[in-house]
Amino acid sequence: MLSEDKIIALYCIVDDMLKALRHKEDVRVRVSDSEVITTAFVAALYFGGHLDYARQFMKCKGYAPQMLDKSRFCRRLHRVSEPLLVMFFELGQYLKDMAGASDYVLDSFPVAVCQNVRIKRCKVLKGKQWHGRCAALAQYFYGVRVQVLTLHGVPVEFCLMPGRENDYGVLQRLPFHVAPESCIYMDAGYTHYQTEDLAFDADAIHLMIGRRANSSRPDEPHIRYLKERMRKGIETTFSEIKAKMLRCIHAVTEKGFLLKVALFVIAFAFYKII
């Protein structure tokens, strides 16, 4: 629910983190980077990612009386995209350090840039690498696969992959900066025995991957039940994130589309800690 307290809390957290990161901005700016990022969070959390609605809301309510126009705001948001990602991973690392050896869940969900019938006319994304299939929904999509590592329902790491790539490819992309003896639960789509053994031998991280019926490493019944039980929570997290998205994410460039998708995950993580 949209409330003044939550918006102010988001701004305070963002502003404090930017100061801690020693982020520098031009002394001539009328709207600070903290206000730009907070407005983007408000857009993702309450306006389905519609930046212009959030921009007008922040100006009308007096949260950012010197708000930029639509074009300049978009340029400023792209300019702070790197500090935005740094803030997210710093927040995630702080939560992981506090948790110590804990249980994590890794899974993915698809985000389509358009409906399948409009793929040929789509100008935001181009190429066969964006064609993917969602096994859970038993349907094809054209867009990105969002890989998210969660701790008690809060995203702490994520990455965006082309829809065509398999889930186990994320095992070489995410840093997995978790404490030794931590367990990361995943479904059978992440099966890769070599990476599983390497993670345990090198970092003492247990990759608790679900097993297929024909797996050469079958699980005991109690281990299979534990893996299935632990993975259920992330579906609730994904439902909450996707509920904040519109049916179609409006963007005119590839970078803009990817930034908006990332914003939904990052804003949700900050929202959960308030």
Question: Where do the model's predicted regions map?
Answer:
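Short alpha-helical elements
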Residues: 1-274
